[in-house]
Amino acid sequence: HYNEVTGEKSRVLQGTATPTIAMIKGFCMGGGLAISLCCDMRYCSPDSVFGLPAAKLGVGYGFEGIRRLLEITSPAYAREICFTGRRFNAEEAKQMQLVNRILPDSEIEAFVEENATMIADNAPLTIGSLKQIFIELAKNPTDRDPERCKPFIEQCFSSEDYIEGRKAFLEKRKAQFK
């Protein structure tokens, strides 16, 4: 039952049309790690601690959670994380590609806010189409359908965003998307 509930919530988070950012400060264990892996980007503070203690607790860990872990890190690291159940620090998490960056406590919130603003300032249709492509690519290879992404891409080229982006580029100014 737990895997069904968390699996559904994870699919909702991972499938949202808006890019998601995990800001990790402190412990990121078990379900917290699973949630962070559903996000598009993950940033942590130096004192963050990561782990997947399912093996230490006798908990069965779901197929989708392991698949997401394998998408992000190598099979060797995924096995180490799962089989040992040990805790690891921010540097190890970065080495395993579980986080994009490690930022000082005093800078992490501003950095995440700045990145979120940069994303929000970009062409909404392009961001949406990119997100849909990433969602499609995250599916099992047999379930992927590149044709499902074509309308999103075509919509970009026939949009006001595209016209504004080209115009801004030629005028050497920042585009103002709606």
Please report, for each region that a protein language model flagged, where it lies by residue:
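CoA-thioester-processing core
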Residues: 9-15, 23, 29-83, 96, ...
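Glycine-rich phosphate-binding loop at the start of an alpha helix
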Residues: 3, 7, 30, 87, ...
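Short alpha-helical scaffolding segments that buttress acidic/His motifs in well-ordered protein cores
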Residues: 81-85, 130-133, 169
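A general structural signal for well-ordered alpha-helical segments in protein cores
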Residues: 6, 66, 75-78, 126-130, ...
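Well-ordered beta-strand positions
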Residues: 41, 80, 84-86, 92, ...
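C-terminal long alpha-helix characteristic of the crotonase
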Residues: 43-48, 99-147, 154-158, 176-178
